[in-house]
Amino acid sequence: PYSSLNPRMTVEDIIGEPLDVHKLYTSKGERRDKILHLMELVGLNAEHATRYAHEFSGGQRQRIGIARALATNPKFIICDEAVSALDVSIQAQVINMFEELQDKLGIAYLFIAHDLLVVHHISDRIAVMYLGRVVEIADADELNASPIHPYTQSLLSAVPYPDPKMAKERQRIILEGDVPSPLHMPTGCAFRTRCKYATEQCAKECPTLTDRGNGHQVACWNK
């Protein structure tokens, strides 16, 4: 949120820029009405319209960016690390806002993040990637309860849980070895250099996603 907004533009001009580019209004009055409506959707007050980006907190700046993204009435939005730079309390507010906007506007999200608690909270289905390849796809609850791919298992084992009993029951999986360079990918499965289940087949051929039931897909030869 700190580098995505032009410091020389007011909030009104930032949110209104997509309207200008795509000519989505017929008068200045209609333009302003649309901007104020977008601001209201993301929880910004009308008096914020004439202020500049540096006058806002990180969470408010993110709301400005989201309002701008909504200006063209999209049906699909890609959210790339949309809350990673925010404090935890602000993250929760922004995520709740995403869900409210989805209910109101029927928007679909592709939510890219490294925080699995956030991902599980907001997602219907989750795809886990390793070095640019999808290694597992499942419904959010299914993936959280029954991960199959060794990489997914290691990721979930590192997630902190507030329940001490649950945290004690979940065994921490420590991966060994170094992450391969994306410029010099290993043959076969990219994860094999860190996987305790790796075999000769893993070095020869990259596994494809196979359905394990209920839409749960995994790319692994040995799991």
Describe the role of every protein-language-model region.
Residues 33, 50-52, 170:
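Interfacial catalytic loop of ABC nucleotide-binding domains
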Residues 139-223:
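Charged, flexible cofactor/metal-binding loops and thiol motifs
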